[in-house]
């Protein structure tokens, strides 16, 4: 019920938001294609992925990621391409988009704006963010917020 919630409609809307957040987290930790999990994944790749996940909201360059992984940028680029089919920067963008999606689902409850979320997730250009978001999730960022706001 809505006993512990300040507003009954908020309780009704929280369920779907929390369910999708849990599914997103499970997908992210289940070792899907983005994680590149497997016995042959180089340590430098794993270190780079972890660094990106921890620091995704910060300004990052390829050199920063390579340094954290203990390899040269070209070596890291090749490892990402070979194991994930992505560049390190494309992987960073996907991690940031996943963070933004989670934040946008929560925005239905917190009232944060799309611009706030995009900026907090490391996107400098709102129109580029919106286009990338739509390409990845099939809906605009504002649609995600509305969908979870209305349940």
Predicted regions and their residues:
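Alpha-helical bundle regulatory/interaction domains
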Residues: 1-57, 61-73, 82-87, 102-127, ...
């Amino acid at each position: 019920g809505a006993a512990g919630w300040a507003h009954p409609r908020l309780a009704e809307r929280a369920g779907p938001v929390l369910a999708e957040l849990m599914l997103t987290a499970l997908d992210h930790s289940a070792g899907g294609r983005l994680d590149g999990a497997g016995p042959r994944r180089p340590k430098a790749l794993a270190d780079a992925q972890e660094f990106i996940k921890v620091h995704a909201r910060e300004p990052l360059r390829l050199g920063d990621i390579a340094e954290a992984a203990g390899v040269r940028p070209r070596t890291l680029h090749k490892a990402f391409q070979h194991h994930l089919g992505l560049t390190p920067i494309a992987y960073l963008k996907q991690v940031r988009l996943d963070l933004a999606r989670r934040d946008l689902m929560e925005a239905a409850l917190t009232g944060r704006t799309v611009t706030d979320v995009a900026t907090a997730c490391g996107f400098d250009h709102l129109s580029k963010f919106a286009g990338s978001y739509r390409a990845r999730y099939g809906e605009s960022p504002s649609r995600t917020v509305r969908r979870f706001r209305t349940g």
